[in-house]
């Protein structure tokens, strides 16, 4: 039974596509083709500085590493755009702690 659940998690994560809406300042993932979506919100707080503020995954989809995909996309955006970032969101703080890549760490403002 546990093995089936593990396969299900992997199947879901391989089908995820993160969309970046720069106008609305959010990363999102549509979940199973439904209207449900997971989001990561950010704001510019300076010309080259963003505040990664909030990550939300609908309760029915939690525990499937969906937020991890959003956090990675957001941190990759920070790197690609050569930005600095405040990590207000606790989940992104956790993600960076678990994935302490130098290109992420050098862009975090404390």
Curated annotation (Swiss-Prot):
Please name the InterPro entries in this protein's record: Acyl_CoA_acyltransferase (IPR016181), Gcn5-rel_NAT (IPR045057), GNAT_YJDJ (IPR031165)
Domain N-acetyltransferase stretches: 19-109
User: Per its UniProt entry, which superkingdom is the organism in?
Assistant: Eukaryota
Q: Where are the transmembrane segments?
A: none
Q: Which PROSITE patterns match?
A: GNAT_YJDJ
Protein family (similarity comment):
Belongs to the NATD1 family.
Spell out the protein name for this chain.
Protein NATD1
């Amino acid at each position: 039974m546990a093995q089936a659940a593990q396969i299900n998690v992997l199947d879901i994560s391989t089908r995820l596509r993160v969309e970046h809406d720069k106008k609305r300042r959010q990363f999102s993932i549509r979940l199973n083709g439904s209207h449900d979506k997971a989001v990561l919100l950010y704001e510019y707080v300076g010309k080259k500085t963003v505040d990664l503020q909030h990550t939300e995954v609908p309760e029915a989809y939690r525990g499937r590493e969906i937020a991890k995909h959003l956090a990675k996309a957001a941190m990759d955006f920070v790197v690609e755009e050569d930005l600095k970032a405040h990590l207000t969101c606790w989940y992104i703080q956790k993600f960076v702690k678990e994935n302490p890549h130098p290109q992420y760490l050098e862009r975090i403002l404390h």
